[in-house]
């Protein structure tokens, strides 16, 4: 979730700074993790499909990943008991049990068959992957995230192997006696990096080299920004060096936009234990909470059911996105659903409500026949608060520029909050529609309109909608 929200916001901000941006995604659609789900479905699925189960395809496949892990752990536990009874130490018994687990051996055999192009395995793989892709598409659409191109590891890893062999021929890499291919990065202060295993199978680095090659061929890029968690910092340091060695001009300027882990009050999000915090469930929970909170505060009064549902969606997703994006991406963070949906403080709903409040002012002004001028009327004596608001609005372009230079969506988020906070103080302290001086009234309405415009632009850069009424 944090990955997609950060990547989407970053793409918007970089584009707003005048750059042509291509949004791509890589799906790891091959490997042992896929085979685990496939094998579990084959053994325990009884032909279950998304249609027969009523589940999203990605959820169903995820369930079988969890199923594999549960059966595997039970198998390892049973084998460990057997080996310890034979006199082995706990660590020895565990290592032997994991190595000899029939279930894991079957998964590895399935992977070998996949690599060899076995028709039955490939058919099962295509079917289950299509379930996952359909589920992903639904989630991305709801999240408001899109891509110009999606790459699949199954199509890129061979390109990577080809590029590694090319590097080997040119003397950039070396081969060990077991046939594995390595890069010697000691001159760069790093270690030796495996690029191809002795049996010729690829590693993650191989796939990333292949994907980079395809991106470079598909688009006239001069910079690549990878949005990946901070546990991969070393990986991307190495990838940058390898791409440079292989002749990609932008290799040295590769940017790893590294971000920290998101935790919930209960703990980190996990997958193998069956305690995953699903993005779809989280979005649904946020929308439901937004509706409940908005109703309690009377913010949905007078709206049709359809309008109320749309406001709940906008507020719920806005709360989720803003809470994540306001934090410096490099830091670990704890996501608190209740705190994020508060209509007061540094939250998405507070900003959205202020925007809706300004739209209400502008509607009433229009109903009164007031036309907002393009320029501020002359001869108006401005207060310090009004001058401050004008300056904050004028600062928006510089803020967007800074956010682009620093690759920091949080700069936009916190600027927008500060602007809204100042406007609310202004709204509280000064009459707008009831101001007796007509020129001052028109000025304050125009100022309100400009604040609303900047709030909308800022939130849109973060991928957040703002409602016209609430």
PLM regions and their residue ranges:
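NTP-dependent nucleotidyl-transfer catalytic core
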Residues: 1-470
